[in-house]
Amino acid sequence: MPLGLKPCCAVCKTQSSSMWKKGNQGEILCNGCTGKAVSSGGSGASASSTIQQNNGGGKQSKQEIHRRSARLRSTKYKAPASEKKVSTKGKGRRHIFKLKNPIKAPESVSTIITSESMFYKGIYYQIGDVIKVIDEDDGKPYYAQIRGFVQDQYCEKSAALTWLIPTQASPRDRFDPSTYIVGPEEDLPRKMEYLEFVCHAPSEYFKSRSCPFPTLPVRPEKGYVWTHIGPTPAVAIKETVG
């Protein structure tokens, strides 16, 4: 029974009963009238006809309205859901990178590689080579000797230098190794892009103040790695042979 409606027996019109049942034609019967309706089918049929007559005149009981409304089904045609279109294009970069969880890149560790030689801009440098550095302030050249090479993790090449100090005999327009003195060593390396190659390691060391023997050659020396650039005094063949 729907909520809020009190049942009423179709035969005896009572509204109190320990148990309610429905007859063969859907009428409501109390517990006392249930046995009578089963024994006398004719009486049940007449009772049901009287119910229909009493409820006639274009009005239906609330029970029957509720029972019919529960059986109503929508007859409106529903078109089947269209299939989802599958994109045939390639997947974008955002989809590719989101497939996996992002991983934090490891911190870069500074690694330094030292070597005794280095190839830079078509020139093969070695330890002991002489280079030239131009000062930005006065524009004068300063000479130094390479004592080591350094390369970092970004392939940036540098060189550790030992400065060469000129003397009064050092020419101003060219480099003469025999007239320079070995100076202080520089602590920090300099980039190779600021260095200009002069010559490879000379055949002899630079001029030494404490050397007991003269370092300046008495006569022209030939067949060495370096030699003077410029005119040399003419020497007789006999002197060179002797």
UniProtKB/Swiss-Prot annotation:
Residues 44-85 are annotated as: Disordered. GO terms for biological process: chromatin organization; regulation of DNA-templated transcription. A zinc finger (GATA-type) spans 9-33. The keyword Nucleus applies. Keywords: Metal-binding, Nucleus, Zinc, Zinc-finger. Component of some chromatin complex recruited to chromatin sites methylated 'Lys-4' of histone H3 (H3K4me), with a preference for trimethylated form (H3K4me3). PANTHER family: GATA ZINC FINGER DOMAIN-CONTAINING, GATA ZINC FINGER DOMAIN-CONTAINING PROTEIN 1. This is GATA zinc finger domain-containing protein 1. It comes from Danio rerio (Zebrafish). The lineage of its organism: Eukaryota, Metazoa, Chordata, Craniata, Vertebrata. The gene is gatad1.
